[in-house]
Amino acid sequence: MTDVFISHAASETNLAYFLKRHLETEGHSAYVAALDVKPGEVWMPAILENLKSSQWVLCLASRNACASPWVMQEMGAAIGSNKKLVPIVWDQSPDELPAWMRQYQAVELGHDEATARAAIGRIADLIKVDKQKGLLILGLLGLGLALFGGK
C-alpha cells in the first residue's frame, strides 16, 4: 500500500520528485507516476491502483496542474474515494485555486528550499500521526477479538 499519491502536471516532475524524496526520508512511501510506472507497464491501471491504495493525495496545485485534465481526473478519483487531499501551492496563492479545491486547506511551499522543506516536514508529521492512529485502531481491534474470541 502506498502512503501518499503525488499528483502533478507533467512539467513539474522535478518538484514531484523533490516532494517524494523528502517524504520517503520521513519513512513514508510515495508514488509519482512519472517516476514509478515501469517501462512496458500499462500506466492507467497502475496509476489508479496506487491512487486507490493511498491514504493521502498531495496535489502539486500549480497553474499548469489546475489546467491539466489528467490532474483533475486524479483529483476527482481522490475525492470520490474519500482520500485526505492536500493542495500544495507555490506559483499561485490558495485563493487562486479552483473553487472546489479551495475547500481543502492548502500548504504553501514558499519560494526557497528551506521553506519548502519545512512545509513538507509538516505534511510528513500529519501523515505519521495518521498512520499511528490507524495502527492503534488495528491493535485495539486485535485485542478485542482476542479477548472476546477466546470466551
Where would I find each of the regions flagged by the language model?
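Conserved N-terminal substructure of TIR/SEFIR domains
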Residues: 1-56, 83, 136-151
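Short glycine-/small-residue-rich Rossmann-like dinucleotide-binding loops
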Residues: 10, 62-63
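Redox-cofactor binding/interface segments in oxidoreductases and associated redox assembly factors
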Residues: 59
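Conserved TIR/SEFIR loop-to-helix hotspot centered on a Trp-containing motif
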Residues: 63-83
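Conserved beta-strand/loop subsegment of P-loop NTPase cores
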Residues: 85-89
